[in-house]
């Protein structure tokens, strides 16, 4: 459940924390997004190398060093671990699915972003806009998991294409079912085989 569906950021991160408690070492997360780049068209995939949080909240803001969790005052510099992301992209492309890389911009939604917000995000170096991913990946990383995140690009961001509507976004996403299956089948063994250190 996402913040745009009336969950708190902390509640949105609970599934990732549960996976960490169950012993998972790596979180492979997929999102849906709009593109800010002309070379990343709807129907494309993009792996995250970093993110910019435009939401005004931090999902770790109420976390404390209790319950077995580490300090919430942790560096985000290696949230999207470069080596693990490189392994992920290589495995996916070897399976025949093209994977771009770039910086993700995060908003809570549920409304789509304004053209002015997208222009600001482009100045910040963002490649895509999304209202899912941030609470989950930050909670997973805080809980000690390594993180790989990617997105399916289902539309162009506001001001860069036709007006955004939900039905076409969902329709294009459904058509990508086979590519999603290929990505998961190819990448899960690759990221599981990379036994680098988890954070925390």
Feature locations, PLM:
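Polyanion-binding loop/helix "lid" in catalytic or ligand-binding cores
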Residues: 69-80, 86, 118, 172-185
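His/Asp/Glu-rich mid-to-C-terminal helical/loop segments that flank catalytic regions of hydrolases
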Residues: 157-200
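Active-site rim beta-loop-alpha module in soluble metabolic enzymes
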Residues: 77-122
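Alpha-helix C-terminal capping segments
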Residues: 20-26, 39, 124, 138-146
């Amino acid at each position: 459940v996402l913040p745009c569906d009336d969950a708190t950021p902390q509640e949105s991160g609970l599934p990732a924390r549960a996976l960490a408690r169950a012993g998972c070492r790596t979180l492979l997360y997929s999102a849906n997004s709009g593109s800010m780049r002309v070379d990343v068209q709807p129907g494309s995939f993009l792996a995250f190398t970093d993110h910019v949080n435009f939401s005004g909240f931090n999902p770790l803001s109420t976390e404390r060093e209790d319950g077995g969790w580490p300090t919430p005052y942790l560096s985000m510099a290696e949230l999207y671990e470069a080596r693990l992301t490189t392994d992920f992209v290589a495995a996916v492309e070897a399976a025949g699915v093209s994977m771009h890389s770039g910086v993700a911009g995060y908003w809570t939604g549920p409304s789509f972003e304004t053209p002015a917000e997208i222009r600001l995000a482009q100045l910040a170096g963002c490649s895509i806009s999304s209202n899912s991913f941030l609470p989950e990946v930050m909670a997973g990383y805080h809980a000690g998991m390594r993180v790989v995140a990617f997105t399916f690009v289902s539309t162009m961001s506001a001001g860069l294409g036709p007006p955004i509507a939900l039905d076409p976004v969902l329709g294009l996403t459904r058509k990508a079912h086979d590519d999603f299956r290929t990505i998961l089948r190819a990448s899960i063994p690759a990221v599981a085989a990379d036994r680098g250190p988890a954070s925390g």
